[in-house]
């Protein structure tokens, strides 16, 4: 029994025009690079904010100060900031120019030296700033609970700024439109 010729040649995978196959491979590579960049952004956000909280507590222990946050406040802080923003950051759209960058080595870690330095700088900045605010509030005569609430508010603010800062490894926060990622904008508000 003879078969009728296929009137649409691209339905047969052996007959797909080469340019169509190549364009789908290129778009797949580009999407993979965007996904990898978003994984790096989420890792940077989570590690830097977690390290900032550790710095805050280490400074309090080192100076024999009262704990700047209660455990329930720390849990609430992580739920409000990291629980929403990391998911929204995973949907960050392409920054553009992914295909102009050279391919990365398969041996290159997600958390490389540059990210380690950025994480250390931002974690130290956030942790020291929050501890300084706590120390100043206590020194000004604030009650301990009021000072803790102030530190909690400050950490929420700092971690919201850090979420915006995590959106790009190469572009400054103020140069990025907040409307490019409406999920992150809503999650931050």
Annotated model-derived regions:
Residues 174-185:
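Cytoplasmic-side transmembrane-helix entry/capping segments in multi-pass membrane proteins
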Residues 2-174:
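Membrane-embedded transport module
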Residues 189:
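C-terminal substrate/ligand-recognition segments
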């Amino acid at each position: 029994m003879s078969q009728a010729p296929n009137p649409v040649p691209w339905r047969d995978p052996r007959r797909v025009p080469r340019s169509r196959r190549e364009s789908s491979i290129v778009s797949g590579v580009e999407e993979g690079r965007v996904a990898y960049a978003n994984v790096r952004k989420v890792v940077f956000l989570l590690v830097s904010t977690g390290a900032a909280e550790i710095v805050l507590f280490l400074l309090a222990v080192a100076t024999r100060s009262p704990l700047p946050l209660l455990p329930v406040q720390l849990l609430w802080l992580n739920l409000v900031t990291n629980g929403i923003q990391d998911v929204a950051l995973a949907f960050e759209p392409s920054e553009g120019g992914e295909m102009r960058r050279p391919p990365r080595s398969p041996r290159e870690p997600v958390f490389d030296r540059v990210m380690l330095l950025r994480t250390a700088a931002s974690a130290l900045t956030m942790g020291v700033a929050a501890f300084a605010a706590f120390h100043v509030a206590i020194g000004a005569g604030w009650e301990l609970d009021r000072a803790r609430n102030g530190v909690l508010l400050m950490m929420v603010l700092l971690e919201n700024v850090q979420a915006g800062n995590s959106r790009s490894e190469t572009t400054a926060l103020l140069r990025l439109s907040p409307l490019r990622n409406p999920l992150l904008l809503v999650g931050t508000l």
